């Protein structure tokens, strides 16, 4: 090769330099790439090791949840109110259906027929081939799940899966629905005790993790497996007594029907000494096993109103919320004259009145700061009256005077003491208070601020509050405060949970009665009890006499408060109520009944005395014997009391006549024999004293029916005679004190209905037309 003048090969120098530069750049790039790769490997293997390991495991293993058994809810005597049982969840794996080329139409068709799920819905889910988990049906009962297993086995379908779950059952349906509450599809509590104590009842779920194949199926010999056992939830025993709850629901439901109640009803039965709730009812009710379904009446009303599907859904959701709402703790209302118990207690405690005090009611009175005279409910007034009579008459004017004797500042202090105001709370909350009952959804009271209420130049708020108006409280607040008035003066915190037990039955916690404070003295409480007993026991003066039960000493107070005026008809809406306690000399229980908007077309005067008091009387008549409270009859009660028909079939006529005479009953013989072969009414029936029992001698009663007469307005004695002439019998649901004076206000079988001979008709009595005016 020719060389240049300097002896070098032409072009050699620049080429070599280019080579060196290229090698250098390649080295730098190689080192840089190595460093990047090393950094990335460090990031993956060191920094993100745990993350990628978890991801790898997630691809190689499948986790199955082991559901915890939710704790059982019992009543105070061990009756099961809520329980869980094993069910299954059926789901499909669209990815596996695709992988194994399974017939998704056949799968969708078969599951639809077995589970009752829409075919198109299942088919659409089966088409989501990127998914390994699509739920077809939850809470599937074992017998149905077994059909799915057979369908899966026969078809050899890998893509159909079944996993264990639990379902909540409520053996008593709607009993104590608002107290117990319910759970959702995921077994999370959504209302009542189920929600308030969800963390206690739910326990902790476990899991099983197993190695899987690329197809997502379990490996025969798992190289990876982990198991964490579930911890079952704890169980709860309530203070609720299922028997008492049933009594209260039965009579409250009947009242809603009898008085055509438009906006539901509520009732509470409480142990006065402890605050334990024996029964809490809110109507309308619903079945806990089907809590999303509203009543047929509500559905029909919504259907008649809704103009579109969207509006229907909105109205349906509102109806659900309304039926789930617990009126006993969530609704506030003006208590009306039932609050006079509180005014009475504070006045007696302060010594500004005594049982010897007297008052005059002219029908109205002027109040400082009020533009118009304040009227009593009784037109023309009650005239002169003692303190006891003022309470019996439920006189508004007398109680305005009593409130003024107490004074606005002391009245406000006692309102706080009885739990209606909380001045220790934040400023934004100082006009309200709650009892703190262990149940979600409790509302607070609504009270005047202290500066407005305690204005000495305007006593209108004090005047209205003295007889239970211009403020709102909840039913649970009222019964708690009234219990304090009659139990010796102790304000107790109401509660529903008696104890919590683990899955082995060991008691974890026990609720002890909690004294909030003593509000009045035992002496004052005794005076309150004595006066309130006269409201029920005095059949001529007391507005609460319809709560009377023969043989039992019951005290109480009526209440009737106005809500609003209906826009179309202009009619007023009322809440009528009655709160009673028994035995009056040593109270064990208190019962509050509240009826929201009774109909004026029911035939009964709208008032607490005429509507709510009889309901409480019927509840007391069932509950007190159940609690072991023995009746103590006066001579007059024994003479007027209804009689139980003895068994005389098989006796000679002479023996039968003697047995019936001893029972306070008469008889008439039908037939020519010497031995009683049958009788009407049957043994065990309770009928009016002196009623005529039919004795059949040698023959049996011939089936016969009569048309039920209208007994309303008749005296008890006249009703007995009217029914007796038809071969029917009468008994008084709320007891008899004077068969000539007491009048029938309601009957168990409606007029015009057919009724068989020998049937016993239960009637409700009130004293007379004059006493019927004692409505508040």
Where are these regions (language model features)?
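Extracytoplasmic
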Residues: 66-69, 76, 84-87, 131, ...
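Beta-lactam-recognizing serine transpeptidase/beta-lactamase-like catalytic domain environment
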Residues: 3, 82, 88, 214-227, ...
């Amino acid at each position: 090769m020719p060389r240049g003048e300097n002896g070098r090969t032409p072009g050699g120098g620049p080429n070599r330099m280019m080579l060196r530069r290229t090698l250098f750049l390649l080295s730098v790039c190689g080192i840089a790439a190595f460093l990047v790769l090393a950094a990335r490997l460090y990031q993956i293997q060191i920094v993100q090791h745990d993350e990628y390991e978890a991801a790898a495991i997630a691809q190689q293993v499948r986790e199955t949840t082991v559901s915890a058994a939710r704790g059982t809810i019992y009543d105070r005597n061990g009756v099961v109110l809520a329980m869980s049982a094993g069910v299954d969840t059926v789901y499909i794996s669209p990815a596996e259906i695709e992988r194994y080329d399974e017939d998704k139409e056949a799968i969708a068709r078969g599951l639809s027929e077995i589970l009752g799920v829409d075919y198109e819905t299942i088919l659409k889910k089966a088409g989501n081939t990127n998914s390994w988990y699509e739920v077809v049906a939850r809470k599937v009962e074992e017998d149905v799940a077994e059909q799915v297993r057979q369908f899966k086995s026969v078809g050899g379908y890998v893509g159909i899966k079944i996993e264990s779950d639990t379902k909540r059952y409520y053996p008593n349906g709607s009993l104590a629905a608002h107290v117990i509450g319910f759970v959702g599809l995921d077994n999370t509590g959504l209302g009542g005790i189920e929600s308030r104590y969800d963390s206690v009842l739910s326990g902790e779920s476990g899991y099983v993790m197993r190695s899987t194949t690329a197809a997502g199926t379990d490996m025969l010999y798992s190289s990876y497996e982990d198991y964490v056992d579930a911890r079952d939830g704890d169980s709860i025993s309530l203070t609720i007594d299922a028997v008492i709850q049933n009594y209260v629901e039965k009579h409250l439901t009947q009242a809603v029907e009898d008085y055509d109640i438009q906006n539901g009803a509520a009732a509470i039965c409480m142990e006065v000494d402890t605050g334990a709730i024996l029964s809490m009812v809110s109507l309308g009710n619903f079945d806990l096993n089907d809590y999303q379904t509203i009543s047929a009446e509500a559905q029909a009303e919504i259907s008649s109103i809704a103009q579109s599907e969207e509006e229907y859904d909105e109205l349906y959701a509102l109806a659900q919320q309304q039926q789930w709402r617990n009126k006993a703790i969530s609704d506030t209302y003006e208590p009306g004259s039932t609050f006079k118990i509180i005014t009475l207690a504070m006045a007696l405690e302060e010594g500004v009145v005594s049982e010897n005090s007297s008052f005059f009611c002219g029908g109205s009175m002027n109040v400082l700061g009020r533009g118009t005279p304040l009227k009593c409910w009784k037109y023309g007034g009650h005239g002169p009256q003692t303190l006891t009579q003022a309470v019996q008459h439920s006189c508004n004017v007398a109680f305005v005077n009593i409130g003024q004797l107490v004074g606005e500042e002391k009245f406000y202090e006692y309102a706080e003491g009885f739990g209606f105001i909380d001045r220790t709370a934040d400023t934004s909350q100082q006009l309200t208070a709650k009892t703190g009952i262990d149940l979600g959804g409790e509302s607070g009271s609504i009270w005047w601020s202290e500066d407005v209420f305690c204005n000495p130049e305007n006593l209108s708020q004090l005047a209205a509050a003295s007889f239970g108006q211009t403020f709102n409280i909840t039913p649970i607040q009222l019964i708690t405060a009234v219990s304090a008035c009659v139990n010796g003066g102790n304000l107790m915190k109401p509660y529903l949970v008696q104890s919590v037990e683990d899955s082995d039955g060991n008691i974890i916690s026990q609720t002890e009665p909690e004294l909030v404070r003593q509000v009045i003295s035992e002496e004052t409480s005794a005076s309150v009890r004595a006066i309130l007993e006269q409201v029920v026991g005095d059949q001529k003066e007391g507005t609460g006499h319809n709560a009377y039960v023969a043989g039992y000493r019951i005290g109480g107070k009526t209440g009737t408060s106005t809500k609003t005026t209906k826009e179309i008809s202009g009619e007023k809406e009322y809440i009528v109520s009655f709160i009673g306690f028994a035995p009056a000399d040593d109270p064990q229980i208190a019962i509050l009944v509240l009826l929201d908007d009774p109909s004026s077309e029911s035939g009964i005067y709208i008032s607490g005395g005429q509507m709510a008091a009889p309901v409480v009387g019927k509840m007391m008549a069932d509950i007190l014997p159940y609690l072991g409270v023995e009746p103590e009859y006066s001579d007059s009660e024994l003479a007027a009391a209804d009689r139980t028909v003895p068994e005389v079939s098989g006796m000679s006529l002479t023996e039968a006549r003697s047995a019936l005479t001893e029972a306070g009953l008469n008889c008439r013989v039908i037939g020519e024999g010497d031995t009683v072969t049958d009788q009407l009414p049957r043994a065990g029936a309770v009928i009016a004293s002196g009623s005529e029992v039919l004795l059949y001698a040698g023959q049996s009663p011939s089936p016969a029916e009569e048309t039920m007469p209208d007994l309303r307005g008749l005296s008890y004695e006249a009703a007995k005679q009217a029914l007796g002439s038809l071969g029917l019998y009468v008994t008084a649901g709320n007891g008899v004190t004077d068969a000539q004076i007491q009048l029938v206000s309601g009957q168990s079988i409606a007029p015009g209905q057919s009724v068989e001979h020998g049937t016993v008709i239960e009637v409700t009595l009130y004293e007379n037309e004059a006493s019927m005016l004692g409505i508040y």
